[in-house]
């Protein structure tokens, strides 16, 4: 591993790392030290597995938001024996001091807050390129971009026409990046794919991509769906968004949320947390949903369930949380009231039709906050250019809830790296006993004391005294 650079001038793509400023490393380290006190799951795994080094020999290509919390994850993986190369999975989500702290430890990282799309795909390629000419053997993904890059590149080796018709700006840069790499190394992607033993996926959108590949028979390696671990989806997605959404809106706009009319589009775990977040500060919250079960849940929680087109002229705040495409379209945007706030807390930037807004007048207020003048003369406030608002305009989810998610990630990486031969080329979830273990590791930090079953009680409900306590189909 190449020594960490000592000045920004030494930060060259493909050498060791690309970060904004190595001088931020001390600041990043101080925040890392605080975060570790709030991440008991990861610290427990270091203590449990640190001497065993179960990830020795693992070469992990990581594509996940380069935050302080992710830095604790990275250092945990390294302490357990892995070699790691890291890029952010979003152009706005990097915390530059976190990236600097990781670079200062000599760990290759390629992430800058506000990087261009061209740079984004260059950096994602960099995590697949080991200095000795080798390849990663594991992928840790968030949104599926690293996995998708390997897969699409492999297809393009066989048929370059798959890159002929990009459907949006992101694909334009992705396709160009793949073409550039193929010109340099025509078999790069297939060689990389052949070395991958498994992938662990963090988020709903990336998991959907994996299941799509499994259904079509194209999944070339086993995958673990970390997102659907209960201690991820019911905590990170729900409680994380409950805190981070309003944090990002307040930091970006300084508006008073109380008294505002807010529409949350999508009432899954992320939408539930987002709705609670806005209601908690006094907003009147409505929900838009396509799923009758989620819609009924929202109604039973006291939210008014509406259609976007029926309320678009009345809402002060719009939040998309669907993981879907073109949810808020131009036909909705042009009808919005003056100073309406529009943001997205789903993984990708295509929930809001930002491309259609490019024809209007934009005024940048500050990073990731734009005023856009509509044909009506009204101006809307677009946050993070329609990308993840909680990481574009704030610092994402708190350390404690991310410890839940990242403890699952480490366990999933250990599982696939050490037992990969036992898994078929399918998508799996972590077993219930590991889910419960993750929860146990976090109880003490918040002063929670667990009641214990007696042997007779356990026998009565037909579960082991030590768990697992619920069947796999149980809905928490």
From Swiss-Prot:
Pathway(s) where this gene product acts: Amino-acid biosynthesis; L-homocysteine biosynthesis; L-homocysteine from S-adenosyl-L-homocysteine: step 1/1
Keywords: Cytoplasm, Hydrolase, NAD, One-carbon metabolism
The protein's Enzyme Commission number: 3.13.2.1
GO MF terms held by the record: adenosylhomocysteinase activity
Reactions catalysed: S-adenosyl-L-homocysteine + H2O = L-homocysteine + adenosine
Cofactors that this protein relies on: NAD(+)
BP GO annotations: L-homocysteine biosynthetic process; one-carbon metabolic process; S-adenosylmethionine cycle
Pfam families listed in its UniProt record: AdoHcyase, AdoHcyase_NAD
GO cellular component: cytosol
Predominant location: cytoplasm
Protein function: May play a key role in the regulation of the intracellular concentration of adenosylhomocysteine.
Similarity field: Belongs to the adenosylhomocysteinase family.
Name of the protein in question: Adenosylhomocysteinase
Protein's organism: Synechococcus sp. (strain CC9605)
Lineage: Bacteria, Bacillati, Cyanobacteriota, Cyanophyceae, Synechococcales
């Amino acid at each position: 591993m190449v020594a960490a650079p000592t000045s920004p001038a030494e930060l060259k793509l493909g050498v060791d790392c690309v970060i904004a400023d190595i001088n931020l490393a001390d600041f990043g380290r101080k925040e890392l030290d605080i975060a570790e006190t709030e991440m008991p799951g990861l610290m427990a795994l270091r203590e449990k597995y640190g001497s065993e080094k179960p990830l020795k020999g693992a070469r992990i290509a990581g594509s996940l938001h380069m935050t302080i919390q992710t830095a604790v994850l990275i250092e945990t993986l390294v302490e357990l024996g892995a070699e790691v190369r890291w890029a952010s999975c979003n152009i706005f989500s990097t915390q530059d001091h976190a990236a600097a702290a990781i670079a200062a430890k000599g760990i290759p990282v390629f992430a800058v807050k506000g990087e261009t799309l061209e740079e984004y795909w260059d950096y994602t390629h960099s995590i697949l390129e080991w200095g000795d000419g080798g390849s990663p053997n594991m992928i840790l993904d968030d949104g599926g971009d690293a996995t998708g890059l390997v897969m699409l590149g492999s297809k393009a080796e066989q048929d370059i026409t798959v890159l002929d018709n990009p459907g949006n700006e992101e694909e334009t840069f992705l396709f160009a990046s793949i073409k550039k790499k193929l010109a340099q190394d025509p078999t790069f992607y297939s060689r990389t794919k052949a070395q991958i033993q498994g992938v662990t996926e963090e988020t709903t959108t990336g998991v959907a991509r994996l299941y799509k590949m499994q259904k079509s028979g194209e999944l070339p390696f086993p995958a673990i769906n970390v997102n659907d671990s209960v201690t991820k989806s019911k905590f990170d997605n729900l409680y994380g968004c409950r805190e981070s959404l309003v944090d990002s809106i307040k930091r970006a706009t300084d508006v008073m949320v109380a008294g505002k009319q807010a529409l949350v589009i999508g009432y899954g775990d992320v939408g539930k947390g987002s709705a609670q977040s806005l209601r908690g500060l006094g907003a009147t919250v409505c929900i838009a949903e396509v799923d009758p079960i989620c819609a009924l849940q929202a109604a039973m929680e006291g939210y008014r369930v509406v259609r976007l087109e029926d309320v678009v002229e009345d809402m002060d705040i719009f939040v998309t949380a669907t993981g879907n495409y073109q949810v808020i379209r131009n036909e909705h945007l042009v009808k919005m009231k003056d100073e309406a706030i529009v943001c997205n807390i789903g993984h990708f930037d295509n929930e809001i039709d930002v491309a259609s807004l490019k024809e209007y007048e934009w005024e940048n207020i500050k990073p990731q906050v734009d005023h856009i003048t509509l044909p009506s003369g009204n101006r809307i406030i677009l946050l993070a250019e329609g990308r993840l608002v909680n990481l574009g305009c704030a610092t994402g989810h708190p350390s404690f809830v991310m410890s839940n998610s990242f403890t699952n990630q480490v366990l999933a990486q250990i599982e696939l790296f050490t037992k990969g031969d036992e898994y078929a080329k399918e998508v799996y979830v972590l077993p219930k006993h590991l889910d419960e273990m993750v929860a146990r590791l976090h109880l003490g930090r918040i002063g929670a004391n667990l009641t214990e079953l007696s042997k007779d009680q356990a026998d009565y409900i037909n579960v082991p005294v030590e768990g697992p306590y619920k069947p796999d189909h149980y809905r928490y």
